[in-house]
């Protein structure tokens, strides 16, 4: 029963960072910066494991490089993803390692040389791996110690890596993979205020060159894409919690070979997240977001439903 109570206390705090990585290839990096994840730096006992499965839908406009004769493009994608995360300790500090995989299926329509076109795509997107470490806040704790620990301010850092593992055909203009590496360093702060957590993150995506861009021999380069996030989340006595989310991103100009650079992206998004415990070890998360303003850049509406299961490592048996 003590373990079950500890898990109940973890559920409103910890979360698996699930990624709809399939979108990254479609929007040239904009979807990466549009993601919003409240409580990404929450603490958890040493040896806590999380697995999550999610389904979702994303629909919105896609921005292409000016060298490509494609305009007024809209994508409607259904997504399925699975993720695993595990807490760890380093020099007495708490951290979290996670990995996520996504599959996408949907339709993309737009005008090619001013002629309406519609295509379908299905396959794996680029995977993602993330490692975070809390530099300020609670140190490593056992489940029993965690259950008694007060809430504290947390400051942490993380690195997300996206390798080119998704479906990619250089002779296709639209792909689910990106055929390049992406790296996102981030700093985060989480402050408890009464029943609330106030979170703020700052990050930037950096990209390698896609040297097999359409029609297969072009080189596509993209400048760093900066992003800031803010979240305000409240925990109820039932351990359910609700979050109000916001993000802004900017930058990410891209060029193909020596062609004209794309416009600098700039967009703001708002969203909401609800997490509901259904048993001591399981919870359901519902999230949605929409673009509030987008001077330039891809603009999406997203909806997500995720299931999460939590468990602890089995403690070593006592020696007789």
Regions picked out by a protein language model, each given a short descriptive name:
Residues 53-55, 82-86, 129-135, 159, ...:
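Residues on the lipid-exposed face of transmembrane beta-strands in outer-membrane beta-barrel proteins
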Residues 47, 74-80, 122-129, 153, ...:
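Residues that define the transmembrane beta-barrel architecture of outer-membrane proteins
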Residues 107, 212, 217-320:
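Outer membrane beta-barrel transmembrane domains
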Residues 49, 61-62, 92-95, 138-139, ...:
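Repeated loop/turn-to-beta-strand initiation elements of outer-membrane beta-barrel proteins
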Residues 29-52, 137-153, 312-320:
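Outer-membrane beta-barrel biogenesis signature
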Residues 51-59, 97-105, 157-163, 200-206, ...:
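Transmembrane beta-barrel strands of outer-membrane/channel proteins
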Residues 105-221, 262-263:
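Outer-membrane pore/translocation modules
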Residues 58-79, 117, 170-177:
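Surface-exposed strand-loop-strand hairpins of Gram-negative outer-membrane beta-barrel proteins
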């Amino acid at each position: 029963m003590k373990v079950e109570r500890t898990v109940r206390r973890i559920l409103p705090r910890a979360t698996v960072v699930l990624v709809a990585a399939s979108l990254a290839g479609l929007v040239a990096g904009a979807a990466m910066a549009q993601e919003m994840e409240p409580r990404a730096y929450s603490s958890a006992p040493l040896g806590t494991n999380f697995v999550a499965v999610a389904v979702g839908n994303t629909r919105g406009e896609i921005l292409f490089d000016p060298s490509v004769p494609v305009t007024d493009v809209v994508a409607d994608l259904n997504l399925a993803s699975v993720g695993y995360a595990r807490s760890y300790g380093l020099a007495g500090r708490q951290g979290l390692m996670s990995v996520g995989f996504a599959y996408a299926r949907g339709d993309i329509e737009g005008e090619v040389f001013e002629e309406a076109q519609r295509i379908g795509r299905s396959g794996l997107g680029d995977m993602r791996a993330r490692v975070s470490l809390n530099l300020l806040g609670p140190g490593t704790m056992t489940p029993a110690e965690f259950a008694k620990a007060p809430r504290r301010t947390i400051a942490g850092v993380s690195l997300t890596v996206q390798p080119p593992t998704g479906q990619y055909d250089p002779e296709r203009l639209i792909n689910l993979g990106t055929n390049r590496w992406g790296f996102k360093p981030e700093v985060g702060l989480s402050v408890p205020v009464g029943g609330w957590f106030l979170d703020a993150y700052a990050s930037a995506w950096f990209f390698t060159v896609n040297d097999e861009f359409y029609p297969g021999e072009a080189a596509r380069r993209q400048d760093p894409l900066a992003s800031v996030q803010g979240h305000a989340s409240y925990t109820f006595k039932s351990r359910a919690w609700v979050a109000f989310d916001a993000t802004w991103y900017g930058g990410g100009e891209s060029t193909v070979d020596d062609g004209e650079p794309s416009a600098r992206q700039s967009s703001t998004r708002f969203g909401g997240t609800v997490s509901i415990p259904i048993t001591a070890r399981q919870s359901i998360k519902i999230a949605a977001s929409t673009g509030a303003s987008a001077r330039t850049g891809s603009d999406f509406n997203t909806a997500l439903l995720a299931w999460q299961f939590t468990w602890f490592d089995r403690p070593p048996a006592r020696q007789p």
